[in-house]
Amino acid sequence: MLIPVGTGVGVTSVSLGVVRAMERHGVNVSFFKPVAQPRPGETGTERSTAVIRAAANINPPEPFALSYAENMITSSNTDILLEEIVARFEEHVKASGAEVLVIEGMVPTDKQPFANKLNYDVAKALDADMVFVTH
């Protein structure tokens, strides 16, 4: 799981680079972003998911909406959110047949102070190795 340590580290670029490198080496790879994190004013498909769809031969699932995740976390339903993330992840693994899934974590920001904890919880729930993305 690629986990950005802050804003502006280029986690989407790193995700795309890892996916493309694996594809070039013949690895059956896919991509998963558990929770969308749109920039102010953005609408439609989450940016990382859209970039991966456009640049690679991959059709990743839609991430959960940020507002949904925030609501689940603030109403003490993080465990349910994690169960739903795991279920979506497992469905995608089964549907894609991928050997490797590149998982992109949330960027920690002032507006999403829960991002680091959620990234850790998601990585733990998915039994994913954590790779920190820095400058």
Positions of the model-derived regions?
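A short, structure-level motif marking secondary-structure boundaries and short turns
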Residues: 2-5, 103-105
